[in-house]
Amino acid sequence: MDGTVCRELLFDDGGAWMQTKTELRITALPDAVMAAIKASQYATYRIDDADFIETLTGEWYLVELESGKQEVKLRIDATGKIL
């Protein structure tokens, strides 16, 4: 917990950093990410959870969407590209 921001850090067995996951408010998602969701086949789904993921190889937003009992997780980069 960093003030009001919750972060999870992942390290390998040798203690080297591998990943940071930062929980986000839905309102903190960039416009490009929101536009990608609205333009996708999941446009009618509700955003349930959002995280910002940082790794050695890249960064992306992990967005969990729900519609009834259906659930999907999308990886979206800062430009709005669904990975």
Segments predicted by a language model, with ranges:
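Short coil turn/linker residues within repeat-based beta-strand modules
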Residues: 14-17, 76-81
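Aromatic side chains
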Residues: 11, 42-45, 61
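Acidic (E/D-rich), amphipathic helical modules within compact regulatory domains
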Residues: 1-24
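Short, non-transmembrane alpha-helical segments in secretory-pathway proteins
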Residues: 24-49
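Short, surface-exposed linear patches
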Residues: 19-21, 32-33, 40-41, 68-70, ...
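Exposed beta-strand-loop-beta-strand "reactive/processing" segments of non-cytosolic proteins
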Residues: 1-9, 51-75, 82
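Surface-exposed beta-strand edges and their flanking turn/coil or helix-capping segments
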Residues: 24, 32-35, 62-63, 75-78
